[in-house]
Structure formats: C-alpha cells, structure tokens
C-alpha cells in the first residue's frame, strides 16, 4: 500500500487500543478462574483473537457484550481436550503461555503458528517445563513450532534461573506452577513486565516477590473478576514518536498504561529532550494521558536493564534517533532478533532504504542523526511493529513515495491504526 507522506502536523486526542500483553493474560486467567470474568477495554487484534479462539476450542464459553468480553471460567480442571490443533497465528505470547498452562492438563494438544511464529524458538519454555516433568516437543534443536504438549497431571516444582529476560517464559512457568504441588522459585535475569504476577494476585492467587526472585506455591484456585484494561503503551509509542518528530504536532494519548515495567520509552523520550507531560493519572489501573509536542531531540545510549522495559518500542525509538542530533547507541537488545522477525535487521533495512544513517550490530543498532528521509519500497516482513514504524517514518518524507508490502501485519495489534492516523492528520 502507499503510505501518506508530507505531514504538516498531527494534532488532537486519541485513545489507543487496549494493552495486548494484558489482554492475552485477562483472557487466559478468565478462562482458568472459577466463575465469570468481565473484561472492559480488551484489544481485539488478531493475536488476542487467537487466544480467545484457543480457549473456545478448549471448551470455555466466551461471548461479547455491549462494551465488554465475558468469560465463563471453568477452573484449571474444567478445560476440555481440543478436537483440532490450536492455531496461535502470529502470537508468540499465546503459544508460550498456553504451553505452560496446558503442560499440567491431562490431555495432549498441538499448538500451531503461521510462518513467522514457526521460526521462533520454543526451547526457552520447553526446557524449564520439561524440568517440571512436562512433555513437550517441537521441531529441531530450537524446538520450533508446531509444538506438541502431552498431558501430565503431576508436575513437580523447580528452582529456575531464566537465561534470558523474558516475561513470556516467566509466565509459562508461573501458569504451570499454579497447578503444581509445592513451591516453584523463578530468578529473573533482568526485571521484565509483571502483568502475569499482577493478574495472579488480582484473581485471588498468591505469590511472593523479592527483587528478581518470584516464589509461588501451588496448587491454587482463582476467582473470576471484573477487569479494566488500559491502552497499550506499545501502540501509543508510534503516536508519541509522531508527535515528537512531525513539525507542528501536539498530541494527547488518553488512558495509556504506565506500569513501571513498561515505561522505559517514556524515560528515553525525556532523556532525548522530548516534551512529554502526564495528565489524568489513574493509579488503580496504572494509566495516564500523555501529551507530546514537536521537539528537538538529541542522541542517547540505551542499554542494560532498561532494555526489557522498552523491548517492543525499540523500532520506533530507532526512528526517533534518525531525527535526533548526534549518535544513538542501542545495546544488549539481541532479543530483537527472535521477535516476529529479526527486528534489528528489519529496522536497519527499512530505515536505511529511506535514507537513515543506521548500522546493525550483533545486539542492537547505531543511528546517527539528524537525517532527512525519502521514499522507498519496503516491507513489514510480516511484523506489525515494523509496519507502524514505517508509516510514522513516511510522514516525514518530502520526496518520493513510500510503499509498504504486507501492511496487513498491523492488524495483529492495531486494527484501526490507519483510521486513527486520518483522525490526527491536519493539512
């Protein structure tokens, strides 16, 4: 598709879709809790829809109400064997978390994914789950999908140190541990998003957290809840970037989640000199309205324990860096290479073709700014975040046309992205 270029200014107020990470977990915990769960603000992107369909296939009643999703929870022991493989689509979160949950069930199931998901390593979950006594098998050394999860009613607790900073791996272990007799202890390499831990407590479960160590005793029973999901900071990130780099822009993003494990982007914006302010802070659901306006930015270094707190925002941070004076260094971000695509290479290719001075490294990128961007024919590589980054980059293009192949990938997390762009466009 052809992308809009030559933006004069983006102005207005916008409410971004519900948080994708929290939406997945809300559906999962609603299904395994006892009683009814009502979810407001759920993201209805393709990834979350895959999770919903998986639980329907496992016998859970899920239906739409006027402004909510209602789940009639069946408890851990109420899931039924699926009559067909569970299709996770493009969703690594769905596959990894469901593998942990289903590892303790008394039936077997096959988890499938699309071409992109079928290239993503699952050994990072099969190893700890196997230590718990689960039987899982994928393809090759990295246990690539399809993934077969064989039923195992009696898992054993483990003490496990995560070799990578991954909330998905942590969550898979926690979902298995909730069904396991005894105490499981997880030691994180770096602190990662804590939505699973928060949701366990929200549904009436118990666990203890001391620094990077999480301890949980099972088995536990969970109770259905009424949930309000804030807007996704990872989706808001693209509009925050647009507001900062498109001259004349002034945007307010309403009801954005500001869980501290996810706000690394906001710290980077402030470090780069961006004009950012918080409004209407709601501490109960950890949300706020964020206002940004066009700013003169400067290059920064991004590395270390900050990386897990902005891992999904690094593509759009790289775009910000192309419009910042000086050099930006992104380090310790090798996890980007095993996302929906190799995001280090994809970001470097797309922005490089558009004229950016950007270089890929083994674990990150080096970006020198400020550089003008020009038209190019590029692809999302099937990655929604690459697609949205490109659409924001195109706004700065004064010469040439930007064409984007496989733009449908954006439906994964933000079905109304281009509609929202039109709402903010000012000639």
Swiss-Prot record:
Q: Which reaction does it catalyse?
A: 3-phosphoshikimate + phosphoenolpyruvate = 5-O-(1-carboxyvinyl)-3-phosphoshikimate + phosphate
Q: Which PANTHER family match?
A: AROM/DEHYDROQUINATE SYNTHASE, PENTAFUNCTIONAL AROM POLYPEPTIDE
Q: What class of enzyme is it?
A: transferase
Q: Where does 3-phosphoshikimate bind?
A: 20-21, 25, 166, 168, 312, 339
Q: What's the protein called, per UniProt?
A: 3-phosphoshikimate 1-carboxyvinyltransferase
**Molecular function as annotated in GO:** 3-phosphoshikimate 1-carboxyvinyltransferase activity
**What's the stated role of this polypeptide?**
Catalyzes the transfer of the enolpyruvyl moiety of phosphoenolpyruvate (PEP) to the 5-hydroxyl of shikimate-3-phosphate (S3P) to produce enolpyruvyl shikimate-3-phosphate and inorganic phosphate.
| Residues that, per the record, bind phosphoenolpyruvate | 20, 92, 120, 168, 343, 385
Record's family?
Belongs to the EPSP synthase family.
Chief location bin: cytoplasm
Question: Which gene is this protein's source?
Answer: aroA
Known NCBIfam families for this protein?
Answer: aroA
**Assembly and partners?**
Monomer.
Pfam families in the cross-refs:
EPSP_synthase
Sorted keywords for this record are: Amino-acid biosynthesis, Aromatic amino acid biosynthesis, Cytoplasm, Transferase
Q: What is its EC number?
A: 2.5.1.19
**What lineage, starting at the top, does this entry show?**
Bacteria, Bacillati, Bacillota, Bacilli, Lactobacillales
- What cellular component GO annotations does this protein have? cytoplasm
Compartments, record wording: Cytoplasm
């Amino acid at each position: 598709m052809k992308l809009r270029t030559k933006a004069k200014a983006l102005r207005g107020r916008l409410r971004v879709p519900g948080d994708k990470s929290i939406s997945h977990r809300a559906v999962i915990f609603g299904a395994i809790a006892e009683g009814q769960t009502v979810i407001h603000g759920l993201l209805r992107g393709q990834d979350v829809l895959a999770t919903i369909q998986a639980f329907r296939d496992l016998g859970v009643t899920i239906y739409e109400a006027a402004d909510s999703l209602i789940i009639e929870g069946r408890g851990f022991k109420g899931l039924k064997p699926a009559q067909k493989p569970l299709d996770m689509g493009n969703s690594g979160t769905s596959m990894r978390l469901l593998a942990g949950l289903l590892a303790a069930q008394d039936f077997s199931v096959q988890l499938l994914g699309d071409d992109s998901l079928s290239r993503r390593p699952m050994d990072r979950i099969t190893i700890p789950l196997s230590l718990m006594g689960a039987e899982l098998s994928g393809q090759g050394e990295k246990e690539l999908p399809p993934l077969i999860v064989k039923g195992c009613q009696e898992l054993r607790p483990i003490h496990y140190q995560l070799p990578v900073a991954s909330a998905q791996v942590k969550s898979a272990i926690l979902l298995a541990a909730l069904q396991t007799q005894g105490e499981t202890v997880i030691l994180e390499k770096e602190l990662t998003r804590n939505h699973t831990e928060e949701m366990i407590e929200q549904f009436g479960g118990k666990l203890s957290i001391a620094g990077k160590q999480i301890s949980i005793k099972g088995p536990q029973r969970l109770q259905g809840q009424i949930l309000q999901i804030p807007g996704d900071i990872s989706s808001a990130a693209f509009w925050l970037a647009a507001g900062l780099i498109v001259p004349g822009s002034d945007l307010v993003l309403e009801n954005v989640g500001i869980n501290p494990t996810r706000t690394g982007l906001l710290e980077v914006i402030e470090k780069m000199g961006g004009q950012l302010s918080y409004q209407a802070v709601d501490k109960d659901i950890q949300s706020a309205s964020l206002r940004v306006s066009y700013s003169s930015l400067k290059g920064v270094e991004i590395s270390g324990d900050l990386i897990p707190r902005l891992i999904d925002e690094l593509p759009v941070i790289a775009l910000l860096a192309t419009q910042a004076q000086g050099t930006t260094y992104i380090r310790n971000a090798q996890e980007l290479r095993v996302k929906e695509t190799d995001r280090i290479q994809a970001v470097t290719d797309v922005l490089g073709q558009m004229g950016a001075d950007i270089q890929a490294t083994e674990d990150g990128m080096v970006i020198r700014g400020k550089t003008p961007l020009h038209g190019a024919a590029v692809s999302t590589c099937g990655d929604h975040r690459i697609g949205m980054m490109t659409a924001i980059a195109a706004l700065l293009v004064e010469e040439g046309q930007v064409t984007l192949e496989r733009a449908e990938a954006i439906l994964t997390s933000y079905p109304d992205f281009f509609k929202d762009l039109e709402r903010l466009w000012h000639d």
